[in-house]
């Protein structure tokens, strides 16, 4: 008896999966439900629900299929909750860490300074990003992929990180120190109140860098991952009348998703640099820059 974890990059592909549990199987405004349980919280009216990593109602499975739309710390946490062999990660000893994962999922990594997290949990978070998140392959956009091995790898790594493994924690500390280099490497140009950044899979996430290396702060970021063909826009702080999710869905349809403060292009589509520039222009115009 085994639990199989599957990644579906689009709603159409996800609809063909007979899943017992779905973990953030959210594709813009489309939510794929599991026959046993659905863990989702990114839809309007669902913001009060816990992120999967903090959802104690997710049942444990002896066998079955778990479906996800993407893999990040919060989604991994939800997947691991379905496995009794990783129940020690959720016994309450590491609640601060999981609260931080929830915070990042809802608010974005750029808000880490407002999370109230301890230095220890911040190092643990960066350790996960450095050792697991950044090592994930780029999954195909046109088919469902078995990710069971990756879930177990993440669980084993988290167990080491949370138990204080020096090698893992050192990688997290080094990642935090890398921020200045990342700022310089991803900077493209300024458009009004928006910083345009270009990254790739190796360089990594950069939507938390609202201040340039010269110390100038901006209201928003538009970032383009040229390997993934993905666009992510985000706001440093809430702006009346500006919703990142609405902008992305207006431009690319309902499968673009996220929150008012941070949102991305449809997971199954490869976006061009021209589309990235147009998105940045739309964001800048709406802000008024």
Residue ranges of predicted features:
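Oxyanion-binding "anion nests"
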Residues: 164-194
